[in-house]
Amino acid sequence: MSRRRRAEKRQVLPDPKFGDLVVTKFMNYVMYEGKKAVAENIIYGAFDILEAKRKDQGPLETFHSALDNVAPAIEVRSRRVGGATYQVPVEVRPDRRRALAIRWLVTAARKRGENTMTEKLAGELLDASNNRGTAVKKREDTHKMAEANRAFSHYRW
């Protein structure tokens, strides 16, 4: 642990189109090398595709439902006890839940087979909002791992 004081959390401004802080966080995860305009075009393009594909729901609702479906409730953390390392299941804090969900969505989108990042992101968001896709599978695997190591839950922090 650092001996200095804890770093302050920086305030993020809401995105210009929807006025949503979570969309801005998502934009920052998509962004490479400080190119925010490129990340903005990718996300808004993906939202346009979502709007065309899902008439029953707006792109922002689809985005938030995708995030909710990917966010893990429980994860495992390594804990050393007497020479053995146990994978101890712990609940995930709300801010980490959102960060993991965003990270998994972006990673899964980058690995998809479509041509442009806009199409990849739209496809992954659509899949995640329908409870399928790589990001949702990652969440399921995390939950399975926690369930398998439930016997070590008494080693909590």
From Swiss-Prot:
GO terms for molecular function: rRNA binding; structural constituent of ribosome; tRNA binding. It comes from Caulobacter vibrioides (strain NA1000 / CB15N) (Caulobacter crescentus). This is Small ribosomal subunit protein uS7. Keywords: Ribonucleoprotein, Ribosomal protein, RNA-binding, rRNA-binding, tRNA-binding. One of the primary rRNA binding proteins, it binds directly to 16S rRNA where it nucleates assembly of the head domain of the 30S subunit. Is located at the subunit interface close to the decoding center, probably blocks exit of the E-site tRNA. GO terms for cellular component: small ribosomal subunit. InterPro entries: Ribosomal_uS7, Ribosomal_uS7_bac/org-type, Ribosomal_uS7_CS, Ribosomal_uS7_dom, Ribosomal_uS7_dom_sf. The keyword Ribosomal protein applies. PROSITE patterns: RIBOSOMAL_S7. The keyword rRNA-binding applies. One of its GO terms (biological process) is translation. Part of the 30S ribosomal subunit. Contacts proteins S9 and S11. Coiled coil: none annotated. Belongs to the universal ribosomal protein uS7 family.
